[in-house]
Amino acid sequence: MHRVVSLFAIVTCVAGIVSSAVAAPPEIRLWPQGMPEPVIPAAPPEKVEKSADGIQRRTNVSQPRLFVYEPPAGVKRTGAAVIVVPGGGFGVLADEHEGSDAAEWLAKNGIVGFQLAHRAPTNKHPSPNAGPAQDLQKAVIEVRRHAAEFKVDPQQVGILGFSAGGQVTLVAATNDRKFQSEEIAESHKPDFLLLLYAYQIYDPKTKGLRADILLDGGLPPTFIAQMGDDRGSLPQGSTLLYLELINRNIPAEIHIYEKGGHGFGMRSRPGATGPTDWQLRAIDWLRLRGYATAP
């Protein structure tokens, strides 16, 4: 009996180790030779915690990197890639329901998902989005550098930004490259964008978009989803962004739902259709452009 139990324990242990190894996605470090300022100290160490509200939060990120989620066996690759930028108010990264869950969802639809872990916290910096925007620009470059490895078309690299990640996405995409640390041939400009309740992109004082979103620099085709009752990211920002895009003849689509609040990511909300419906609309939008597999 003892021998059977011991054997069972060994098999279970080995299976757990193998399962854990398989579950861990590959990583791409963004700044192996050192990142530009502002630098996040290595201490305290990086921490990932899930609290009582069921939200996983990552913080103390001193080594920005990408986690790679490839389409599973049997799913046809489209050649597209999407970098997922979680929200978290620049203090933490909500990197499960606004990160890995989204990357896995994209992978199931034939898209290689790259989850960004940008430097954090930066919420006490003079410009909280500056470091994360550098990381995102470098992430786009690194995805193009690794295009052959992950069977990605370097001209089909998009970004999906949630909340603060949406703000970072717009700043990174509309500004010139924010670092000069090395010779770079690849462009940091994405080929398409998906924005979910982008955080504080509306300036109530000017009744316009925030000053560091430079739309005259150009944006690619953009999908926007927003909840009308969102008090964390006001719907005026998403609406104004959409109007600015169509006034510039940039292909854009927007979905505004009555209810759903803020920060739902890939999760449903009781009594609200928006938090799940946007996923269907986004996949339709991606399919029309050949970025996602047919149903």
Where do the model's predicted regions map?
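Short beta-strand/loop motif that positions the catalytic acidic residue
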Residues: 218, 223-226
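Primarily recognizes the serine-hydrolase "nucleophile elbow" in alpha/beta-hydrolase
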Residues: 134-217
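C-terminal catalytic histidine-bearing segment of alpha/beta-hydrolase fold enzymes
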Residues: 239-242, 246-295
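Catalytic nucleophile-loop/oxyanion-hole region of alpha/beta-hydrolase
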Residues: 94-95, 101, 118-151, 267-275
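Short beta-strand element of the alpha/beta-hydrolase
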Residues: 78-87
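Short amphipathic alpha-helix adjacent to the substrate-entry channel of hydrolases
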Residues: 95-114
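N-terminal cap/lid segment of alpha/beta-hydrolase-fold proteins
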Residues: 24-77
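Conserved alpha/beta-hydrolase "acid-adjacent" motif
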Residues: 231-240
